[in-house]
């Protein structure tokens, strides 16, 4: 593989994440809400609680978590039409990914017969919307679970581990972390990696665009993703600590 450039078009090093920040509580009625910013990508993540579970889950004493994902009309250079009656395959794939990733770290017995509803609405899309949605939704979910314990709804938080996600890819034969749109749109390989706080993988989504990639290239991309995910989890913890100190 060719040597990585010292800097990318936005000035980042190949192994450098985009700037990460969180705006808390933009919605007054949700159990928790935030806007997560990764570079120019911004996603509104909110959590609501229903005191019931899907019909197939009733009587088991177990909870459930469901996620929805949408691109808002003005989130891209050309307006995105609202998906009303029928969801696109991409939207269905992404919201299932978000739900799977978060359910993996929820103790459904602690939740009881309740459903946590996660909504991820993309305000601005500059690539990495699914990974930003997972990373931001985990933060919103953490805040929601803490609130439910404080309110006496739950005895203890059902959240048992941390989750973050990041993209990696091959662009002009070079491995890059956290691709923006200018990179993602010309990547030969696009990989999304979801990881739990204990370092175990929750999901890997990888696609070759035009030509196959090797096992060694896959390993290089995973090796690039791992420290990036650790940094994102540290940023999640820092964001919550800063939020807690002013509330």
From Swiss-Prot:
GO terms for biological process: rRNA catabolic process; rRNA processing; tRNA processing. Pfam families: RNase_PH, RNase_PH_C. The keyword RNA-binding applies. One of its GO terms (molecular function) is 3'-5'-RNA exonuclease activity. It catalyses: tRNA(n+1) + phosphate = tRNA(n) + a ribonucleoside 5'-diphosphate. Its EC number is 2.7.7.56. Phosphorolytic 3'-5' exoribonuclease that plays an important role in tRNA 3'-end maturation. Removes nucleotide residues following the 3'-CCA terminus of tRNAs; can also add nucleotides to the ends of RNA molecules by using nucleoside diphosphates as substrates, but this may not be physiologically important. Probably plays a role in initiation of 16S rRNA degradation (leading to ribosome degradation) during starvation. This is Ribonuclease PH. It comes from Synechococcus sp. (strain CC9605).
């Amino acid at each position: 593989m060719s040597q990585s450039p010292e800097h990318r078009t936005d000035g980042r090093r190949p192994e450098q994440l985009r700037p990460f920040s969180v705006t808390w509580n933009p919605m007054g009625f949700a159990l928790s809400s935030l806007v997560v910013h990764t570079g120019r990508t911004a996603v509104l993540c909110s959590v609501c609680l229903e005191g019931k579970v899907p019909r197939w889950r009733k009587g088991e004493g177990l909870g459930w978590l469901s996620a929805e994902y949408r691109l808002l009309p003005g989130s891209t250079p050309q307006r995105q039409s609202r998906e009303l009656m029928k969801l696109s395959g991409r939207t269905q794939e992404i919201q299932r990914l978000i739900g799977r990733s978060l359910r993996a770290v929820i103790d459904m017995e602690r939740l009881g017969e309740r459903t946590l509803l996660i909504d991820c609405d993309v305000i601005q899309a500059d690539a990495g919307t699914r990974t930003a949605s997972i990373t931001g939704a985990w933060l919103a979910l953490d805040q929601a679970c803490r609130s439910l314990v404080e309110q006496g709804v739950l005895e203890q938080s059902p959240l048992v581990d941390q989750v973050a996600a990041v993209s990696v890819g091959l662009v002009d034969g070079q491995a890059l972390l956290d691709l923006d749109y200018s990179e993602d749109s010309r990547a030969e390989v696009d990989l999304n990696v979801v990881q739990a706080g204990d370092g175990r993988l929750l999901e890997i989504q990888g696609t070759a665009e035009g030509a196959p990639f090797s096992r060694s290239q896959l390993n290089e991309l995973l090796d690039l993703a791992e420290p990036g995910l650790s940094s994102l989890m540290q940023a999640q913890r820092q964001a919550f600590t800063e939020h807690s100190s002013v509330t």
